[in-house]
Amino acid sequence: MIIETNQACDLVIFGTKGDLARRKLLPALYKLEKSQKIHPDTRIIGTGRADWNTEDYIKIVKKAIKMFLNEKIDEKIWKKLRSRLNFFYIDVFQDLHFLELKNILNQKKNIIIYYCAVPSNTFNAIFTGLGKVNLNSFPSRIIIEKPLGVSLETSKKINNQIAKYFLESQIFRIDHYLGKESILNLLALRFSNSFFFHSWNNKIIDHIQITVSEEVGIENRWNYFDQMGQTRDMVQNHLLQILTIVSMDKPKNITPEGIRDEKLKILRSLKKIDLNEIHIKTARGQYASGIINGKKVPSYIEENGANKHSKTETFVSIKVDINNDRWFGVPFYLRTGKRLAYKYSEIVIVFKKISKNLFQEFNKNLSPNKLIIRLEPNESIKIYFLNKVPGLSKEYKLKSDKMEFNFNINNTKNFVDAYERLLFESMRGIQSLFVCREEVEEAWKWIDPIINGWKKTNINTVQLYKSGTWGPKSSDEIIMRDGRFWETFN
């Protein structure tokens, strides 16, 4: 068992030149330095095949932090972070390079954490190289980014490869959505407040929507994205994890095992979508050209390096049913896409209306109560409720009002970025916010039949939608068939 404490570490970043490292990891490490959460003896070792020395690497790191940090660099903090930085040239297909890396790591007795910020097709070379020189021994840890593979079969292959060299307790599969403050607060919201705890079921809740909307396109990731599509990249990866947190039963305790057990129960309770339902419960789209933030943007098949005949989806929405007592009859509507009208992610819990409302005589089409949990931007919680319109009228006119709690405004000093939190948790050896092998594979078991169903039926085509809109009409039809509507961004 890994000891859960903040110990001196050697953080080895494979792929330190890449987009993930520059945009997310390096700014997160700066913030951890700022909050004094990094052990004084911790080292950060960037690796790659770039023709750099450590001084070159230091300049690259500072440039990345300046570009992607949402605040001005404090030179005192930078000086501390800079002192930790080292660069090591490595070709992961060369065994000799791992021996040289071992010599560097043996200079200190720090716990080693490997962060694989690289494509999954290079994972096995890293696992094998580390294993050959015994750099995989306990209590070293390894962090890998989801999604793992493109199917259950390929995911199992990656998991089998890493299991040859690392114990499950050493493996930290990262899903950055699980590090968001609003997702973590969802556990507190649900299980520590009686009015939510007793209302979180099919007697009180009508339906739940989960939306992850992106303004960006594929961002020069054609080769990666075209083999993945939005379903593999986002639904299997992020939205199903959000769904499990929203819907799981109360865990026995707040341990990694306690939380994972309940999440697994949900994944195993997801109702499979049959071939005869697939056109009713799913919708796919691909972005056409359009206008985003006042600028014209190309269609998916006009992107650099694109296959003009590609049918890969950049948008997907799915109606999900959970086969258990708590959620029987409560649909979950998921949607996610690229080049949509706004960038935002949120969970919408819509409560059932009162069957015989006392004020219905004076009010037609009363809005339902809603709880909206905004994940990004500006993480917040909003509660919508009905309130009397002030005035002297004898009629009881009602309107929908809201109460809002904004994490950024109310907790400015304590607000923590997702990658900042997840890196810190990995340094402490706490796996609660990371995904176990069974979760990954159960998610693929549910997703694979949907993707295969699209191939088997005559709906293996995608509807085009204009960039800057909310996706194809078929997405609206999924929810409108049930007499419901997507909650619009505001």
UniProtKB/Swiss-Prot annotation:
Biological processes, Gene Ontology terms: glucose metabolic process; pentose-phosphate shunt, oxidative branch
Source lineage: Bacteria, Pseudomonadati, Pseudomonadota, Gammaproteobacteria, Enterobacterales
One Pfam family per UniProt: G6PD_N
Listed EC numbers: 1.1.1.49
Keywords tagged on the record: Carbohydrate metabolism, Glucose metabolism, NADP, Oxidoreductase
Binding site for NADP(+): R49, D91, V92, K146
Pathways involved: Carbohydrate degradation; pentose phosphate pathway; D-ribulose 5-phosphate from D-glucose 6-phosphate (oxidative stage): step 1/3
Catalytically driven reaction(s): D-glucose 6-phosphate + NADP(+) = 6-phospho-D-glucono-1,5-lactone + NADPH + H(+)
GO molecular function: glucose-6-phosphate dehydrogenase activity; NADP binding
Family statement: Belongs to the glucose-6-phosphate dehydrogenase family.
Organism: Buchnera aphidicola subsp. Schizaphis graminum (strain Sg)
Binding site for substrate: H176, K180, E214, D233, K338, K343
Functional description taken from the UniProt entry: Catalyzes the oxidation of glucose 6-phosphate to 6-phosphogluconolactone.
Record-linked SUPFAM superfamilies: Glyceraldehyde-3-phosphate dehydrogenase-like, C-terminal domain, NAD(P)-binding Rossmann-fold domains
Protein name as catalogued: Glucose-6-phosphate 1-dehydrogenase
Active site residues according to the UniProt entry: H238 (proton acceptor)
GO-annotated cellular components: cytosol
Group of enzyme by EC: oxidoreductase
